[in-house]
Amino acid sequence: MAYRDQPLGELALSIPRASALFRQYDMDYCCGGKQTLARAAARHDVDIDIIEAQLAQLAEQPIEKDWRAVPLADIIDHIVVRYHDRHREQLPELILQATKVERVHADKPNVPRGLTKYLTALHEELSSHMMKEEQILFPMIKQGMGRQATGPISVMESEHDEAGELVDVIKHVTKNVTPPPEACTTWKAMYNGINEMIDDLMEHISLENNVLFPRALAGE
């Protein structure tokens, strides 16, 4: 099956572990979920035939859960517990680790300078964002008022883009979250945590941008 003309967001939802494959190629399937596979492959200089073959292999496996068929209230409850609560745990710990690494290894050429600042900015951005979703947007959707939520959804999508831009800066500062040979245990653990946080955030944004918001706006 040809996947090249399909949007990344749709592929991430319909093919098991496609999201992990896109992350491997640094393809944005959440905020950039509307771009086709062909366009994303061209932007990242990826052989379209190779990634299509990889997707075909993944597609042979049964999908764990098709969120496109799950009631919106259940999706919202899942987002809050699986992603919002998790981000609230992840980011303060990562900020503490980054503060320590930047202080202890200040003289190392590969130290991720500015990482604490950017993680703090992401934490503040997401804290405000998630609170607005939980207090304003999610209750509207649960009450069947999704069609009236065009404004709040537009704001949330814009804030998703801003969070994505901060993640890009964090990836740049950390050399794509790759620890240097001299990295200590804390440094390596922090990078593992950052990778996990980015994976979670991309899944989180994809579920909202590509499933929850379109279905809410359609009046479900």
UniProtKB/Swiss-Prot annotation:
GO cellular component, one term: cytosol
Coiled-coil region(s): none
First and last residue of the signal peptide: none
GO MF annotation: an example: nitrite reductase activity
Predominant place of localization: cytoplasm
Entry keywords, A to Z: Cytoplasm, Iron, Metal-binding, Stress response
UniProt record, GO biological process: protein repair; response to nitrosative stress; response to oxidative stress
Location(s) in or outside the cell: Cytoplasm
HAMAP family for the chain: RIC_YtfE (MF_01606)
Biological role stated in the UniProt entry: Di-iron-containing protein involved in the repair of iron-sulfur clusters damaged by oxidative and nitrosative stress conditions.
NCBIfam families per UniProt: FeS_repair_RIC (TIGR03652), PRK10992.1 (NF008221)
Subunit relationships: Homodimer.
Family under the similarity heading: Belongs to the RIC family. YtfE subfamily.
Protein name: Iron-sulfur cluster repair protein YtfE
